[in-house]
């Protein structure tokens, strides 16, 4: 389209009426008086933009419109049937395949002369660069070829020099051999043996042999004479002191051996005759092996555990000898049994060898090396605060007020039964709280919480004072070296006495700042919120004094606070990050468990992107439920994580086998000497979290005494399964479910086998119920109770009853047909049964204190005045723990 296009011509080209085109030009801001006026290219572009805007389309450059016109997109759909094998049956599935393809029409717009010139220059530059690269490649190829030629020449020269040196060495060896032969020829020769001379008899009784005719002279006479001096020297003298023989010496040794054996009686000649195989003589060389004269002391590398067979192999002894040595030491072990390092070291030294410690921690060393790389700049981190104190003193209520939640009401029995981890964004900054149980059974939980923490807040009720778990919490804080802040709670109650609490803490060496000490004590009320701000201020001040810092970047490491088994999510571990940053997708190792982090959850159920230092989170994706208190660390890949976990599992299993395997002889004798009637109560414990499992196991095993032993045969996290029920049925155990339930298959097995299954939600009830069950196993105890004492005043004789003691009841009641004892000078001289009890010649059933009576003792007539008759009865008393 030329530059002199009129409005009329443009209307014909676009097939639009002239009046409408004039209106569109006017709308675009261009005034034209008539259809014969000329429209420029810029005005056309302006009109096109106005029309695109009016139709709701973005403005587009001509090049883009041209390119879009040359582009087409096709959507294709194709349906087909696919057969899927699922077990024994086949299923047909309809599959729809969708394809989207875009086609672009080739061809570009015509280039301007400047663009053509630039394109030609670009192609020339590319050709020049390509030629330069080819020249450089040819030059490099020539250089490599020249280097190969030079290297081949150098190797050829070196080979020639080596051959000349070997030839020269062979000539020198031949010259030395000739000189040795000449020296040997110069020695005096031994007289030749006269074959015709008669030989002396071997024994005096043997008759002299008749002279034989002279045989023909031997053909090899000169050769035998030449070899005679060589035989005098012996075949080993020439090569004495040489460890490695050259080819010439090896050939000469072979020739000399052949010459020595050729032509002799009994030797093998060239015709194939028999060779003399007798030992000794001049041909006998030194032995290849000599028996050691001193004992061989070996250094044996021993790991943490080793089997008896492996130890015997390292000691080069038979397994029976090692077992015998172990028996002498008092250790009963079989050849396939594992023993610990100390026992293996002792038996090794007993057998005369030296034991050294073997390093079998390859995976652990690699883990330490990988974690040691996480070095960065330490930044300030939030403090970790543990709330500790006696049960029902308001620890969880205090944390509830700070978090503005209601956790205490949701706890069974109103007491905390596992560690709760939270981080709270307070006006004083972020603070991470750990809420520990106060019950006596949760000692290990409180100790674990004290080790993880930076500051311990000891909650003491103002109306209750210092209690046993309060003292225990003080000891945990001291052993962990953690600063203590005392929160005196419940000051809003009428009988609150904070001064009494301070005085009682003073006896535990916890001195308040008011009394000149260094322990901050804050009076609070978790119910009304009084003093909570002062407590947060005290925590912030203490955290500033501690200058808490940690590396915020790199691989994370920390401690497992609690763990559980969720039916829908699998193993769940609550961890506290201490260093680095824990992210989704990291590979981590927790004790003997490993896995990849599939998800992170905070205490509110949200999924954070990462967790930094001092932040507790829940981790999903582990291979199993880790132990509470295990350390966790993030590693670079899954292979290292798996190796470390398997190595730890192997060590733990071997240690457990060593601990439970064959007892020592003294242990067996002690077991035989103990009461054979000791009862055993087997338990299977399943709980919701790992910390509760540990607390229950420790608390219940501690109930054992010399009469009954409580044995936890299995414990774990999660619901009661079929395997748990089978284990309990086989061992006749009681199943305890703490905040968990049995599934349908487990209930069927429990009902069919009559297994005792009990559900609990409070640890008090568990301990009380187990005490009752154990008491039922103990049975009853027969106890003797004295009910009356009578003093003999006089003795009467009766023809029917014999001796009758006229007595006075001085204490209690004497009853008929009850067992009695006769005491003389406070010493029991007879024990029997009361045969007759009379008062005024009338038989009575009992005689009370201060009343006279006549007593006849069955089968006993040696009653004297002054004796005492003790009447007692036997009662059954239930035995308790």
UniProtKB/Swiss-Prot annotation:
One Pfam family, short name please?
IF-2
Q: Which residues form a coiled coil?
A: none
Query: Which region ranges are annotated with the description Disordered?
Result: 53-92, 163-292
Ranges where the record places region G5: 525-527
Residues covered by region (G2): 414-418
Q: Where can this protein be found?
A: Cytoplasm
Q: Which GO terms describe its cellular component?
A: cytosol
Region G1: which residues? 389-396
Cite the entry's keywords alphabetically: Cytoplasm, GTP-binding, Initiation factor, Nucleotide-binding, Protein biosynthesis
Q: Which residues form the tr-type G domain?
A: 380-549
Stretches for region G3: 435-438
Q: Where does GTP bind?
A: 389-396, 435-439, 489-492
Where in the sequence does UniProt note compositional bias of the Polar residues kind? 81-92
Q: Where is the composition biased (Basic and acidic residues)?
A: 219-236
**GO terms of molecular function:** GTP binding; GTPase activity; guanosine tetraphosphate binding; translation initiation factor activity
Instruction: Spell out the Low complexity composition-biased ranges.
Output: 172-186, 254-263
Which parts of the sequence are annotated with region: G4?
489-492
Q: Which PROSITE patterns match?
A: G_TR_2, IF2
Gene3D superfamilies tied to this protein? P-loop containing nucleotide triphosphate hydrolases, Putative DNA-binding domain, N-terminal subdomain of bacterial translation initiation factor IF2, Translation factors, Translation initiation factor IF- 2, domain 3
**Which family, according to UniProt?**
Belongs to the TRAFAC class translation factor GTPase superfamily. Classic translation factor GTPase family. IF-2 subfamily.
Briefly, what is this protein's role?
One of the essential components for the initiation of protein synthesis. Protects formylmethionyl-tRNA from spontaneous hydrolysis and promotes its binding to the 30S ribosomal subunits. Also involved in the hydrolysis of GTP during the formation of the 70S ribosomal complex.
- HAMAP family for the chain: IF_2_B
In Swiss-Prot or TrEMBL terms, this protein is called: Translation initiation factor IF-2
Q: Which organism is it from?
A: Stenotrophomonas maltophilia (strain K279a)
Q: What is the lineage of its organism?
A: Bacteria, Pseudomonadati, Pseudomonadota, Gammaproteobacteria, Lysobacterales
């Amino acid at each position: 389209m030329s530059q002199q296009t009129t409005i009329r011509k443009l209307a014909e080209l676009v097939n639009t009426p002239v009046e409408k085109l004039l209106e569109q030009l006017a709308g675009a801001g261009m005034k034209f008086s008539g259809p014969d006026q000329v429209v420029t290219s810029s005005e056309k572009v302006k009109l096109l933009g106005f029309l695109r805007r009016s139709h709701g389309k973005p403005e587009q450059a001509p090049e883009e419109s041209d390119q879009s016109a040359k582009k087409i997109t096709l959507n294709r759909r194709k349906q087909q049937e696919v057969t899927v094998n699922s077990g024994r049956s086949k299923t047909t599935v309809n599959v729809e395949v969708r394809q989207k393809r875009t086609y672009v029409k080739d061809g570009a717009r015509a280039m301007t002369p400047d663009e053509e010139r630039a394109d030609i220059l670009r192609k020339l530059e590319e050709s020049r660069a390509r030629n330069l690269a080819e020249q450089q490649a040819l030059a490099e190829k020539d250089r490599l070829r020249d280097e190969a030629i030079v290297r081949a020449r150098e190797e050829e020269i070196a080979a020639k020099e080596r051959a000349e040196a070997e030839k020269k060495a062979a000539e020198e060896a031949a010259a030395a051999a000739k000189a040795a032969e000449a020296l040997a020829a110069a020695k005096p020769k031994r007289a030749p043996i006269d074959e015709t001379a008669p030989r002396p008899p071997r024994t005096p009784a043997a008759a002299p042999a008749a002279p034989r005719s002279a045989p023909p002279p031997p053909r090899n006479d000169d050769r035998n004479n030449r070899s005679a001096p060589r035989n005098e020297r012996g075949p080993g003298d020439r090569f004495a002191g040489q460890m490695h023989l050259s080819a010439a010496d090896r050939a000469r040794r072979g020739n000399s051996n052949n010459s020595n054996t050729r032509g002799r009686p009994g030797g093998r000649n060239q015709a194939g005759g028999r060779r003399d195989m007798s030992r000794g003589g001049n041909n006998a060389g030194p032995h290849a092996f000599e028996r050691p004269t001193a004992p061989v002391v070996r250094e044996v590398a021993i790991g943490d555990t080793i089997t008896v067979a492996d130890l015997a192999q390292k000691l080069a002894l038979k397994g029976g000898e090692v077992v015998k040595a172990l028996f002498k030491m008092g250790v009963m072990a079989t050849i396939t049994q594992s023993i610990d390092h100390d026992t293996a070291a002792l038996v090794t030294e007993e057998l005369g060898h030296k034991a050294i410690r073997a390093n079998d921690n390859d995976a652990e060393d690699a883990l330490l090396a990988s974690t040691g790389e996480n070095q960065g700049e330490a930044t300030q981190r939030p403090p970790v605060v543990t709330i500790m104190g006696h049960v029902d003193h308001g620890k969880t209520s205090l944390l509830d007020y700070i978090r503005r939640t209601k956790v205490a009401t949701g706890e069974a029995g109103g007491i905390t039964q596992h560690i709760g981890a939270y981080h709270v964004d307070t006006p004083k900054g972020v603070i991470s709280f750990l809420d520990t149980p106060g019950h006596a059974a949760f000692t290990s939980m409180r100790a674990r919480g004290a080790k993880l923490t930076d500051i311990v807040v000891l909650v003491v009720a103002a109306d209750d004072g210092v209690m046993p778990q309060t003292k225990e919490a003080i000891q945990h804080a001291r052993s962990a070296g953690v600063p203590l802040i005392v929160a005196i709670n419940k000051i809003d109650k009428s009988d609150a006495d904070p001064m009494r609490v301070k005085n009682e803490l003073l006896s535990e060496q916890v001195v308040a700042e008011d009394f000149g000490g260094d322990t901050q004590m804050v009076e609070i009320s978790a119910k009304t919120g009084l003093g909570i701000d002062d407590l947060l201020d005290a925590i912030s001040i203490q955290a500033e004094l501690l200058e808490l810092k940690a590396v915020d970047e790199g691989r994370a490491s920390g401690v497992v606070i609690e763990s559980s088994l969720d039916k829908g999510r699998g193993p769940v571990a609550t961890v506290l990050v201490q260093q680095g940053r824990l992210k989704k997708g990291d590979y981590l190792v927790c004790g003997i468990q490993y896995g990849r982090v599939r998800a992170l959850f905070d205490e509110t159920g949200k999924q954070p992107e990462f967790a930094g230092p001092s932040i507790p989170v829940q981790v999903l994706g582990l291979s199993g439920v880790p132990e509470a208190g295990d350390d966790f660390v993030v590693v670079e890949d899954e292979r290292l994580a798996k190796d470390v976990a398997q190595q730890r599992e192997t060590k733990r299993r071997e240690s457990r086998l060593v601990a439970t395997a064959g007892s020592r002889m003294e242990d067996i004798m002690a077991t035989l000497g103990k009461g054979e009637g000791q009862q055993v109560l087997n338990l299977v414990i399943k709980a919701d979290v790992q910390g509760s499992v540990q607390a229950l196991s420790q608390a219940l095993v501690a109930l054992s005494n010399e009469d009954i032993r409580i044995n936890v045969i299995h414990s774990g996290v999660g619901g009661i399964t079929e395997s748990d029920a089978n284990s309990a049925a086989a061992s006749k155990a009681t199943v305890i479910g703490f905040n968990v339930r049995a599934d349908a298959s487990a209930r069927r097995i429990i009902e069919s086998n009559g297994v005792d299954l009990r559900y609990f939600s409070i640890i008090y009830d568990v301990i009380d119920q187990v005490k009752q069950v154990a008491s039922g196993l103990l049975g009853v105890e027969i106890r003797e109770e004295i009910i009356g004492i009578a003093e003999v005043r006089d003795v009467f004789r009766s023809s029917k009853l014999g001796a009758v003691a006229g007595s006075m009841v001085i204490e209690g009641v004497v009853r008929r047909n009850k067992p009695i004892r006769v005491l003389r000078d406070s010493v029991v001289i007879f024990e029997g049964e009361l045969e007759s009890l009379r008062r005024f010649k009338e038989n009575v059933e009992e005689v009370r204190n201060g009343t006279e009576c006549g007593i006849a003792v069955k089968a006993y007539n040696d009653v004297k005045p002054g004796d005492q008759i003790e009447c007692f009865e036997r009662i059954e008393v239930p035995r308790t723990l």
